Amino acid sequence: MSTVPPPLSVLLELTHRCPLACPYCSNPIALAALREEMDTAGWRSLLEQAAEMGVLQAHFSGGEPMLRKDLPELVAHARALGLYSNLITSGVAGGEPMLDQLQAAGLEHVQLSVQDVDPAGADHIAGYRNSLSKKRAFAAAVRARGLPLTLNAVIHRHNAERVPGMIALALEWGAERIEVAHTQYYGWGLRNRAALMPSREQLAATIVAVETARRSLGDQLAIDFVTPDYYARQPKPCMGGWAQRFVNISPRGDVLPCHAAETIDGLQFEKLRDRSLADIWNHGEAFARFRGTAWMPEVCQGCPKREIDWGGCRCQALALAGDAATLDPVCERSPAHAGIRATAEREAASPAPDFIYRRPERPAAVAAEAAISDTE
């Protein structure tokens, strides 16, 4: 019997492979290689264990999940187990043949990323040519098959002025929902923070754009909005609270409380091949470490919002304050709060450096060979 309520959702990061190279990607810097990915049997077992626990939703993500040839089989297995299935995709891989297979397998929803409404801007962010036209065609194919569509628009200093256009694009493409989400600075996003950080004025303009669209569109389009943490005064309840509502499975089969949890040194993350999902969720050391409120520092213990924001993001506390067990520096009570606000304002006011694109590191031998070739 479970000792804690089961997670609502499981996120299956099937692969880190992706045609795009977005500099804000939240995948880890050390990307999993193809040879490290969990096999079909492992993912099927994961879905079975999740359903047995009482999980309701399976989100297929990556990288680009449509690069996995077994994706239709996994979606069909999720459907047979009674799990709601959602595909999170770039829309530039697999195309209509794969989409036909996914529809036949019982896929229930598609989330499609959009980098910009300007074709050149979209390609610049994605590191991929003709990305917007391919996404447009994919969105049309999704809607032609009657599948619900959500657009995920990631906002930063280079596209903030075009939020109204992104909302209009969602209507044009037949989406039922759009998530207008400012970049969250984890993984590659943290590495590229200075290149992506918007100004306070840009943030204010995006808020006005979203509020205006909500009033004018009403029920025509659902609009979610996520602010950049660095300008906030209160932390968000990251993942609905550590190890409370969501569980993340990495391409290697590691069971994680969130996608960035591996950045926290000292936590031991276990693999599905070594221990059951239920046992890890209920009794795993890493899951218990920051679950609930007992771990919180004194200033959090007395906060009336402690069971609303659950202390904020542990990975961000480590990255910005040097301690995963301290206050999320987004919180105005944190000694580090003023510093991260100043950092955001300084970076936003400075010229944007070049992007460091999300690409896997080449093996040392290959890199050395390439370096020799470059000198010949």
UniProtKB/Swiss-Prot annotation:
Gene3D superfamilies: Aldolase class I. Its EC number is 1.21.98.4. CDD domains: Radical_SAM, SPASM_PqqE. Residues 4-219 form the Radical SAM core domain. Binds 1 [4Fe-4S] cluster. The cluster is coordinated with 3 cysteines and an exchangeable S-adenosyl-L-methionine. One of its GO terms (biological process) is pyrroloquinoline quinone biosynthetic process. SUPFAM superfamilies: Radical SAM enzymes. The keyword Oxidoreductase applies. Pfam families: Radical_SAM, SPASM. It comes from the Bacteria. The keyword Iron applies. Pathway: Cofactor biosynthesis; pyrroloquinoline quinone biosynthesis. Catalyzes the cross-linking of a glutamate residue and a tyrosine residue in the PqqA protein as part of the biosynthesis of pyrroloquinoline quinone (PQQ). This is PqqA peptide cyclase. It comes from Xanthomonas campestris pv. campestris (strain B100). The gene is pqqE.
